[in-house]
Amino acid sequence: LAFGIPLIQRLAQTKGKGLIIALTRELALQIDEELMKFGRSVALRTAVLIGGQSMRIQQQKIRKIPHVIIATPGRLIDHLEQKTVQLSDVRVLILDEADRMLDMGFAPQIKRILQAVPGERQTMLFSATMPSEVMHMAKMYMKLPIRIEIAPSGTAAEKVSQEVFIVRKDE
């Protein structure tokens, strides 16, 4: 959730909303919980749009004009098709675990969502790995993408030690 505080800060300075695309329902709920820890003090309103929950309850949340929408790709597409959510005021788009979304076949849904948000926006793409599909998406849908790498691919963490314990089968 490296994007939580910068997102809240950015939205406090500008009009518009944030949109976070999460891979799973569980991740979407976790993101919402963490954002609310930071956002309560600024009266942050969120709407979580995930499968397995009532569309009607989600529509009620949307009507309260949330600052941030956190959604799984499929459920967001459902809301777009039913015209119950409007993304024209999205100023910050965050794709969390983009590599896994593409691995799981969500590329068509992601492209549909990217077409529904304004061209003038900040886009943040978070990925544990950076396969060519993710790089291609970044080049297609981002203006002047900047790659920030925590550690070069294939490097071991310095402070991690590994140990092997040999145990008998009966233990």
Q: Could you describe each region identified by the protein language model?
A:
Residues V167-E171:
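Short, intrinsically disordered, charge-balanced linker/junction segments flanking boundaries
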Residues Q13-E81, S88-V92, M135-K139, R147-I150, ...:
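Conserved nucleic-acid-binding Ia/Ib motif block in the N-terminal RecA-like helicase ATPase lobe
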Residues L1, M55-Q58, A107-P108:
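Switch II of P-loop NTPase G domains
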Residues I8, A28, R56, I77, ...:
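Nucleotide phosphate-binding site architecture
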Residues D32, Q86-L95, D99-A157:
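Post-DEXD/H (motif II) to motif III coupling segment of the RecA-like Helicase ATP-binding lobe
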Residues L1-Q9, G16, D32:
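Motif I (Walker A/P-loop) of helicase-class P-loop NTPases
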